[in-house]
Amino acid sequence: MQKGPCGTELGRLSSKQNMDSAQPTKLDFLTVPATPFSIGVLASIVVLVTVVIGPKAVIDTVLNSYLSLVHRIPAADGKKYMSGPAYTFPNGQMVDKFLAARTRSWEWEEKYGKTYRIWAASIPEVVITDPKDVEVLYQQSTDHNKAPQANAGWLLTQLLGSGLGLINGTRWSTLRKTLDPMFSHRAALQYLRDSLDAGAQDYVAGIHQFAKADGQVQTADGKVMVINATQALQRYPFFEVASMFYGKMSEAEHERLWDLGRRYSEVFAAIVSGGIHRSKLTRYLNTKAWNNARDYQKAWRDFNREIYTARKMTAPDTPIVALTEAAERGELTPNEVTDTIAESTFANLDIVTHVISSCIILLADSPEVQNDLLQEMEKNKADRENYITRKDTLLHYCLLESLRLRPVLCLKEYWLTQVKAFTFPENPPREKILGNFVVPKDTTIIVDAFAINIRNPFWGPDNRAYRPSRFAGIKQSQLRYNLATFGYGPRKCLGQHIADKIVKAVVYHLFSKYRVSLMPMQAVEGDFKVDKTSWVALYDVDLKLEPRES
């Protein structure tokens, strides 16, 4: 039996699909004349099979056989080929990789081994689950390219095609060089002192506005409030990240940006569903998703142009001014500016919300750890800002443990450089030996973060238990390939220096002000409830907040 983050027994996964890829077999055929009779019989058989098992099953079988033959990946000893779930038309495993990653991660490794192949539409992606293979992958990785269109199709390029996470080569290095000073360690520390810490404190002070209407619970000590973790927390990281580009924003600008985020999410949902939206056909057929994308693009360009004009007059040092003027000088393109801001805010809204809510929910479910954290925070409250930046504290370990157990990792390069449980696809320009298979150059490779963060023997027999203190005895160098958080290689997360501070600042102020616990009935099948309408499966968990004594 497997265990949840707090040691809860979970049932073993039982839903198994017959997803084996066809293994190529060499056959010697007799020479048969192609007579009208034999062709007619063959055609009749094809029609009969199609009627009996259905046209989609026939298409899936034929295409899987063809793709498995064309994209064979041999073992180093030449005795077998890499296996994996069968291709299914039209998306392959793309939807499962987004929406059922946690379940599929376990199923696929159990069925196909530690190195296997899945399909992003008709594109093969090699999945690695062993830290040793991760190390091999990222040796000599300075020239790795991100997969074209992230293997997600054409419509994605209309949202983020020129953003930092999707471009390669000189375009990437030029844009990254422009952005790095804005998100350096020094800049992150200054941001914490100037606004982040105060912003987190103000947000927690006003969190009562998100209290559920029926969530006031009378206790002997007075009233406590009940909040939904996701709904109460998601605006905080969204506007903190936005302010790094736009500076201090008005309430009207906040609401306009929030609406743009909603419109972005509608289009992204169509991207996740795949199908026709993977190609330009979605444009030629004038689909609703394409119309929504076009309307969003115009509104997004207008918003950034107006913000630039306003900040140029009132706050010329704001990053949006510097980035826009770099585009005007021809150093960047306008789309590189707007798409990078979009991936840093909209593409990461659900991701960052999940990271923060995971950290808080796991603490709420562990009163002992919460009490230890409170004692540590009390000892360090006189030097709060320095405490939040440190990486040798229980506060930091709580963040790492939540990232380990709940690796929802993002689509883009700004925050956490991974998609759900699987890293952002990239194509090494050289052959790699991974899991004893010879992976050809330019083949897409992804890392399974659930395998690295949880099933990895490095984490010991309690690898599914929530125990933040485990990090106290682990050297940073040991985590390099045993913990998937901010990505690997030269394209490691641009926002790594500020990401942890955003999370830890709000955790510090929330738990300093409130005793946080779970309301009853917040688990389903041994894990916390989730909102299945979100592609990230955000938590649908209610928290009880009881004010601490001053």
Curated annotation (Swiss-Prot):
Indicate which residues the UniProt annotation says bind heme.
Answer: 493
Enumerate the GO terms in the molecular function aspect.
heme binding; iron ion binding; monooxygenase activity; oxidoreductase activity, acting on paired donors, with incorporation or reduction of molecular oxygen
Q: Where are the transmembrane segments?
A: 39-59
Question: Which cellular component, as a GO term, is one annotated location?
Answer: membrane
This protein's record includes keyword Transport: no
EC id:
1.-.-.-
Pathway this chain belongs to: Secondary metabolite biosynthesis
Q: How does it sit in the membrane?
A: Single-pass membrane protein
Name the source's superkingdom: Eukaryota
Cofactor section? heme
Q: What is its main location?
A: membrane
> One GO BP annotation here?
small molecule biosynthetic process
Loss of this gene results in the following: Abolishes hexadehydro-astechrome production and instead accumulates large quantities of a single shunt metabolite, the prenylated Trp-Ala diketopiperazine, terezine D.
The UniProt keywords, alphabetically, are: Heme, Iron, Membrane, Metal-binding, Monooxygenase, Oxidoreductase, Transmembrane, Transmembrane helix, Virulence
Give the UniProt subcellular location, in the record's own words: Membrane
The induction text for this entry reads:
The expression of the hexadehydro-astechrome cluster is induced by glucose.
Family named by the database record? Belongs to the cytochrome P450 family.
Function as written in the Swiss-Prot or TrEMBL entry: Cytochrome P450 monooxygenase; part of the gene cluster that mediates the biosynthesis of hexadehydro-astechrome (HAS), a tryptophan-derived iron(III)-complex that acts as a virulence factor in infected mice. Within the pathway, hasH, with the O-methyltransferase hasC and the FAD-linked oxidoreductase hasG, convert the hasE-prenylated Trp-Ala dipeptide into an O-methylated diketopiperazine that is then released from the hasD NRPS. The HAS biosynthesis begins with the synthesis of a tethered Trp-Ala dipeptide by the NRPS hasD.
Name of the protein in its database record: Cytochrome P450 monooxygenase hasH
Organism, per UniProt?
Aspergillus fumigatus (strain CBS 144.89 / FGSC A1163 / CEA10)
Q: Tell me the gene name.
A: hasH
